[in-house]
């Protein structure tokens, strides 16, 4: 029986990365409320979000021989969590706090298969060069900042702000492919 992977996400970047990795998948629409719990650590939050997304998707997919993937990304700097910007000034605040500084991107993944949950969190340090106000304005005008954690996408025009990374490029983009492959192997996705 052919195994199916379902992506419980609306992220075009996650779809692109799965295509890049050559992993066939279907989409399942299973949004979850992304709200932190009292005293929840950033790592616990991002991991819980991936698990909740995968479980929510699993509950919507018929059949037994299915694997459902959930993922979430947050940015952490100086103990503060940065999600998606709510408006232009929020994006400005985020990008200027990264300007000339280092921050951490945390991307979690979870796979649910037949009641079992496999999960991991990938942390990548990202170093920005200084960004001017005019560069921010130009970047904001591209529209790229609006739907991304930390108000930037490493794969887009914000790449020019990134001096270097320590960790996984694909995790910063939204789906750590090495960790995904590891979890797919652990969950016997590739087995005949």
Curated annotation (Swiss-Prot):
Disulfide feature: none
Similarity field: Belongs to the Maf family. YhdE subfamily.
GO cellular component assignments: cytoplasm
Main location per the UniProt record: cytoplasm
Catalytic activity annotation: dTTP + H2O = dTMP + diphosphate + H(+); UTP + H2O = UMP + diphosphate + H(+)
SUPFAM superfamilies linked to this entry: ITPase-like (SSF52972)
Keyword Cytoplasm: yes
Pfam families reported in the protein's UniProt record: Maf (PF02545)
EC number: 3.6.1.9
Keywords from the named record: Cytoplasm, Hydrolase, Nucleotide metabolism
Record-given protein name: dTTP/UTP pyrophosphatase
Keyword Oxidoreductase in record: no
Site positions (Important for substrate specificity): 13, 73, 155
GO biological processes: nucleotide metabolic process
Domain of life: Bacteria
Compartment annotation: Cytoplasm
InterPro entries, per the entry: ITPase-like_fam (IPR029001), Maf-like (IPR003697)
GO function terms (MF aspect): dTTP diphosphatase activity; UTP diphosphatase activity
Active site: 72
Organism of this sequence: Hydrogenovibrio crunogenus (strain DSM 25203 / XCL-2) (Thiomicrospira crunogena)
Function per UniProt: Nucleoside triphosphate pyrophosphatase that hydrolyzes dTTP and UTP. May have a dual role in cell division arrest and in preventing the incorporation of modified nucleotides into cellular nucleic acids.
Cofactor(s) this protein requires: a divalent metal cation
């Amino acid at each position: 029986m052919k195994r199916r992977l379902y992506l419980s996400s609306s992220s075009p970047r996650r779809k692109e990365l799965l295509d890049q990795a050559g992993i066939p998948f279907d989409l399942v629409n299973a949004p979850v409320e992304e709200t932190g719990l009292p005293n929840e650590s950033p790592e616990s939050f991002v991991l819980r979000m991936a698990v909740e997304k995968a479980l929510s998707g699993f509950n919507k997919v018929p059949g037994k021989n299915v694997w459902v993937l959930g993922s979430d990304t947050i940015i952490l700097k100086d103990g503060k969590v940065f999600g998606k910007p709510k408006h232009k000034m929020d994006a400005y605040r985020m990008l200027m706090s990264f300007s000339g500084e280092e921050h951490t991107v945390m991307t979690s993944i979870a796979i649910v298969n037949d009641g079992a949950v496999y999960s991991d969190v990938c942390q990548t340090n990202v170093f920005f060069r200084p960004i001017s106000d005019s560069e921010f304005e130009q970047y904001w005008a591209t529209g790229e900042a609006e739907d991304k954690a930390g108000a930037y996408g490493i794969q887009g025009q914000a790449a020019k702000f990134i001096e270097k990374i320590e960790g996984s490029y694909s995790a910063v983009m939204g789906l750590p492919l090495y960790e995904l492959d590891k979890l797919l192997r652990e969950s016997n996705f590739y087995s005949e």
